[in-house]
Regions:
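Hydrophobic anchor at the beta1->P-loop junction of P-loop NTPases
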Residues: 13-15
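ATP-binding Walker
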Residues: 21
Length: 152
């Protein structure tokens, strides 16, 4: 799979999708193509900054708002944020566009089979099980386990 990304048009990139969809994989792939990048993993932000939040939909909205704030600080420092989170909503997606951050939803082709084996899907407040994405226009990238080539 070849993914073309215009570095001159965007100041950052944000991958979002269900647990196990490949967000970290895509982040790792694109970082080698972009100088002055800073990786922002939603799990790390939750552990280091948002430990006061739980996994409810309301707290997920607060979490991604904080992640956007971090991304904006990175952009102001003339660096390129590469972000990955599970959740995204219509408002933050809109603010990302205003800040020239491209948002991509990662979908896994074989996810139905995989989901049954993930322990996380036995818990509550799980995106894709109890919490669903709001209805907004999303750019989708299908992870079908084929080799990925980023063209920047």
């Amino acid at each position: 799979m070849i993914f073309r990304f215009n570095k001159k048009k965007y100041k950052g990139i944000w991958f979002f999708g269900l647990s196990g969809s490949g967000k970290t994989y895509f982040s790792e792939k694109i970082k080698s193509k972009i100088k002055n990048h800073v990786l922002v993993d939603g799990d790390n932000v939750r552990k280091l900054i948002s430990s006061d939040l739980n996994y409810s939909k309301a707290h997920r909205k607060i979490q991604i708002s904080r992640v956007l704030g971090i991304a904006r600080l990175i952009i102001e420092s003339n660096k390129f944020p590469i972000i990955s989170t599970v959740y995204m909503d219509k408002n933050i997606n809109y603010l990302c566009k205003k800040n020239k951050i491209m948002c991509l939803m990662i979908l896994r082709k074989d996810f139905g089979k995989m989901k049954k084996n993930f322990i996380i899907y036995k818990k509550k407040n799980v995106v894709g099980k109890d919490i669903f994405y709001e209805n907004f226009k999303k750019i989708e990238l299908i992870n079908d386990n084929s080799p990925l080539i980023f063209k920047c």
